[in-house]
């Protein structure tokens, strides 16, 4: 099913397309409706494979939420995945965990009266708990990376053993000394600067930004509105480090990049602060995953499955396939020196080598520069199949997906060559 999802990715996911014929369609439908097949089992299988590749590595466990089904009668379906990324070279290691939940209009009312265990925000702590499995599997370090929606007191106070936290501050929290979080950096001298490339976003072209860095220890106070019974189990404060990165001289028609990052990592000098900002910037990886999963790739938002169970299984399978696409993108330069078997069957090697020989030109830039048997070698082949010329820019997820679609079509003919 994984291969067929990749093959159909650029056309959107449909059971009829996946099945290819009536018999195949029935098999896929039975799989999706089989109560013995669960999303948790599918995700757990992918997670075991990811854990097997984590030993000795500093892993960023990046988590975020995206809507995969728009609200109907005020109810929408959201997906919350956790992916593992190598903190040093940016290699996508794989999927750690994923879950679905419904978002209902009006739920924000009364949220302060609910226990944390009953809130949807519990998913952020659950994601960190699954990330701790990477540490148990031998990862040298695990850092959970979250955007502002993950700025939850319990996320820090109940942090699982074996992981560090890195969260972009989403609210001006009260500190134990009575001051406010956002005012802290204003009292500090600039510790140093760094330049970062900001990717394009809606209404904002890509640019290079110069960031002024400041950092200091902070002690976050327990929120006053927590229910008494639940709050009694939480510490009165949590000691963290605040790292602020504020853009200097932003474009006149743009908004300055301004990140306030809370972390459990020790930050002793400006080099440590730059490292923390670098970890946070890797969060863009999960945005690329969502882009591949949705309109620009598998188009899961257009799925016509009416029942939640089969719908979630099909989205989960698409998520696993989209993660494979992202692995190829991140290994296009061969930095991680990953083997072909990370994303391909061993028997695919001969086909990839034959296609590479056919695609290579006479100039050095038209030659596949990567060793045979490596994932980078396959990434170059798929990028060329997806329309990349080898001269301009670097191939992204959509180009790689188009290349995978073509490769699976070629592979079908390759497998029939001796029939």
Where are the regions a protein language model picked out?
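Single, function-defining residue in the core of a domain
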Residues: 1-62, 66, 70-78, 83-419
């Amino acid at each position: 099913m994984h291969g067929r999802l990749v093959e159909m990715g650029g056309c959107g996911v449909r059971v009829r397309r996946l099945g290819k014929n009536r018999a195949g369609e029935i098999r896929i439908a039975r799989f999706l409706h089989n109560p013995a097949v669960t999303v948790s089992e599918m995700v757990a299988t992918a997670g075991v494979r990811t854990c097997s590749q984590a030993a000795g590595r500093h892993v960023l466990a990046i988590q975020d939420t995206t809507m995969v089904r728009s609200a109907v009668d005020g109810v929408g379906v959201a997906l919350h995945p956790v992916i593992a990324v190598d903190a040093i070279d940016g290699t996508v290691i794989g999927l750690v965990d994923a879950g679905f939940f419904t978002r209902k209009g009006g739920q924000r009312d009364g949220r302060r009266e609910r226990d944390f265990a009953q809130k949807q925000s519990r998913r952020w702590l659950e994601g960190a708990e699954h990330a701790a499995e990477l540490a148990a599997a031998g990862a040298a370090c695990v850092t959970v990376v979250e955007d502002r929606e993950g700025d939850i007191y319990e996320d820090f106070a109940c942090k699982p053993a074996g992981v560090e936290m890195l969260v972009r501050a989403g609210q001006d929290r009260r500190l134990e000394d009575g001051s406010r979080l956002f005012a802290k950096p204003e009292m500090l001298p600039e510790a140093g600067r760094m330049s970062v490339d900001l990717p394009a976003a809606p209404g904002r072209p890509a640019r290079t930004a110069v960031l002024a860095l400041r950092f200091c220890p902070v002690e976050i106070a327990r929120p006053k509105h927590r229910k008494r019974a639940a709050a009694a189990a939480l510490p009165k404060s949590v000691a963290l480090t605040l790292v602020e990165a504020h853009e200097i001289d932003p474009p006149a028609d743009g908004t300055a990049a301004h990140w306030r990052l809370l972390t459990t990592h020790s930050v002793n000098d400006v080099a440590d602060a730059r490292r923390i900002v670098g970890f946070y910037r890797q969060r863009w990886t999960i945005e690329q995953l969502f882009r591949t999963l949705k309109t620009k790739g598998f188009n899961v938002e257009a799925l016509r499955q009416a029942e939640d169970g089969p719908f979630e299984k099909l989205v989960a399978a698409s998520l696993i396939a989209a993660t494979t696409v992202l692995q190829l993108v991140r290994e296009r330069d061969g930095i991680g020196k990953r083997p072909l078997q990370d994303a391909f069957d061993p028997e695919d090697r001969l086909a990839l080598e034959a296609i590479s020989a056919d695609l290579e030109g006479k100039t050095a830039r038209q030659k596949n520069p990567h060793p045979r048997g490596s994932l980078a070698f396959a990434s170059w082949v798929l990028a060329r199949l997806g329309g990349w010329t080898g001269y301009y820019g670097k191939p992204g997820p959509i180009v790689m997906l188009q290349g995978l679609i073509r490769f699976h079509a070629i592979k079908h003919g390759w497998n029939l060559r001796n029939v």
